[in-house]
A protein has these predicted regions:
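Histidine-rich, glycine-flanked metal-binding segment
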Residues: 35-78
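Divalent metal-coordination and catalytic microenvironments
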Residues: 29, 45, 50, 74, ...
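His/Asp/Glu-enriched, well-ordered alpha-helical/loop segment
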Residues: 93, 100-105, 111-112, 233, ...
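Catalytic beta/alpha-barrel core
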Residues: 235-239, 257-266, 290-292
Length: 430
C-alpha cells in the first residue's frame, strides 16, 4: 500500500518518460545521508536535474518549485546501495554456460580482460537488485586462467541501455590459497608470478619489454601498466594475516600501487598495520567459520575491529551474485554491538559501509552512495529502517530517474499469490 501511495503521489509516468531526470523533493522523512552519521528525523532531500541539491533537516530545505512527493510518516530515504565485487550483468543462469560470462579460464588473456564490454543491462539480476535498493555496483569476473582476474567495471542499475559508469575501474589479482592454485600449487609460485608481472609491465611502460622472453602477453602487460603507475586500483583477494602483510609490503617496492584488500577474513589480526598503510578493505560482512586454512581466525567481529582500528571498510555480501543482501549484513553488524564481547558497527557506520565507503573505494567518492549537494541523484525510498530485514524499497531513483521495480521474481510472486486458478493459461488445464 505504501508503495502505491508514494508512486501515485509523485505522479511518476515511467512509460512516458523513461529516461528523463525528475525534479522532486521528499520531506518529513527519516533521512540517512550515507556519510557515517546517524539518521536525521524529520529530514528532507531535494533533487534537481539528476543531482542532489539539498539533504538535511526539513527546516533547512530551500524553497523550490519542484514536486513534493507525499509519503507516510514512517518513510525512510537513503542514497542507493553500492554493491562491490559482484558479477551483476555478466550472467543469467549460472548452470547455462551460454548465458554465463563470469568465467574465462580458457582465455589466452587475463589482466587484459575488460568486463565492461559484456554487461547486459537487461539481465534479470540487475532488475532484482535494483528493486532491492542497489543503484550501483562494481562487477568483476569470478575466474580466469591466471592469478589476474581482469579489469572490473562500475555500473549503474538503471533501466536503460548504457549501464557503464566507469570502465576498467580496477584490476583484480588473486593471492592466498586461490592464487596458489592458479599459479602452480604454492604461494611461493604466486608471489613470483605476481612480481614478474609487475616487472614486465614496468618494462613495457619504459619501452624495455622483450616479447620473446616475456611471460605475459602483450595485451596483459599493457593492461598492467595502469596498475604499476597507480592510475588503476588493484583489488587484491587475500584472507590470511600473513598474506595481508605480504601485500602491504609490496608498496615498499612499488610505491605507486593503489591497493584494495578484498576478503581479509583475518584482517582484524593486522588491523593497525592495514590502517597505517592507508589501504581500504572490502570484507565479507559476517564470515565466522573457517571454510579454509587461510580463514582459521575468521570472526563476525572482523569488520567492527578493523573499523575501530581506523581501517576504511566496505561490506561485501559474501556471495558475488547476491549483493541484494547487503542491508541485512549491515543490520546484523549493528546488532553485534549488543552482543557481549563482540565488535560491530553503529547504524551510521554500517550504512556507510554499503553506500559511501564502497563508492569511495570504487572511485566515486562524493558522487555516489551519499546524499550531499552535487552527488548523483541515486535515491531510495523505504517503508521502514533499511537495515531491518522486513523493510523494502518503495521507490528507487538513479540519476534522478524513477526506476521500475518490477522483475521476474515480482511477477511470479504476483501471479501465484492468489490460489485462484481461473485465469491460468489453457496449458495448465490437464
Amino acid at each position: 500500500m505504501k508503495r502505491l501511495l508514494i508512486l501515485a503521489a509523485s505522479g511518476i509516468a515511467l512509460a512516458a518518460t523513461p529516461a528523463l531526470a525528475q525534479d522532486f523533493a521528499l520531506s518529513g522523512v527519516t533521512l540517512a545521508t550515507g556519510d557515517g552519521s546517524e539518521p536525521i528525523e524529520n529530514g528532507a532531500v531535494l533533487v534537481r536535474s539528476g543531482k542532489v541539491v539539498y539533504a538535511g533537516p526539513a527546516s533547512g530545505m530551500p524553497e523550490s518549485p519542484v514536486q513534493l512527493i507525499q509519503v507516510p510518516e514512517d518513510t525512510w530515504v537513503t542514497p542507493g546501495l553500492f554493491a562491490t565485487v559482484t558479477t551483476l550483468g555478466l550472467w543469467d543462469v549460472g548452470a547455462v554456460s551460454e548465458s554465463n560470462d563470469t568465467r574465462a579460464g580458457d582465455s589466452p588473456f587475463n589482466a587484459a580482460l575488460d568486463v565492461s564490454r559484456a554487461i547486459n543491462p537487461a539481465s534479470q539480476h540487475i532488475k532484482i537488485h535494483r528493486a532491492a535498493g542497489v543503484t550501483r555496483a562494481a562487477t568483476v569476473l569470478s575466474t580466469t586462467g591466471s592469478i589476474f582476474g581482469g579489469q572490473g567495471t562500475v555500473i549503474d542499475l538503471g533501466d536503460d541501455a548504457d549501464p557503464v559508469t566507469t570502465p576498467r575501474a580496477f584490476q583484480v589479482v588473486h593471492l592466498g590459497e586461490n592464487g596458489a592454485r592458479l599459479a602452480g600449487g604454492s604461494r611461493v609460485a604466486t608471489y613470483a608470478e605476481f612480481a614478474n608481472a609487475l616487472r614486465e609491465a614496468r618494462d613495457f611502460a619504459n619501452g624495455r619489454w622483450d616479447a620473446e622472453s616475456a611471460m605475459l602477453t602483450r595485451a596483459d602487460a599493457e593492461a598492467l601498466v595502469a596498475v604499476v603507475n597507480g592510475r588503476q586500483k588493484l583489488y587484491v583477494a587475500v584472507e590470511r594475516a600473513s598474506d595481508i602483510r605480504a601485500v602491504l609490503g609490496l608498496k615498499r617496492e612499488y610505491r605507486s600501487l593503489d591497493l584494495v584488500l578484498v576478503g581479509a577474513s583475518e584482517g582484524w589480526l593486522v588491523a593497525p598495520e592495514i590502517a597505517a598503510a592507508g589501504v581500504p578493505v572490502i570484507a565479507d560482512g559476517l564470515d565466522d567459520l573457517p571454510r579454509s586454512f587461510e580463514e582459521l581466525a575468521s570472526t563476525q567481529s572482523n569488520v567492527g575491529r578493523m573499523a575501530a582500528a581506523g581501517v576504511k571498510v566496505a561490506i561485501n555480501a559474501s556471495a558475488m551474485e547476491n549483493p541484494r543482501n547487503l542491508n541485512q549484513y549491515a543490520g546484523n553488524l549493528v546488532a553485534l554491538t549488543r552482543v557481549p564481547g563482540a565488535d560491530g558497527l553503529s547504524w551510521g557506520q554500517a550504512f556507510a559501509a554499503i553506500s559511501s565507503v564502497p563508492a569511495e573505494i570504487s572511485g566515486l567518492g562524493g558522487r555516489a552512495g551519499t546524499l550531499t549537494p552535487g552527488a548523483l541523484g541515486d535515491v531510495v525510498v523505504w517503508d521502514g529502517d533499511p537495515l531491518e530485514v522486513g523493510s523494502v524499497p518503495v521507490a528507487v531513483y538513479i540519476d534522478g530517474v524513477a526506476q521500475p521495480l518490477e522483475n521476474h521474481q515480482s511477477r511470479l510472486r504476483d501471479r501465484y499469490r492468489d490460489l485462484d486458478e481461473s485465469d491460468l493459461p489453457k496449458a495448465f488445464d490437464w
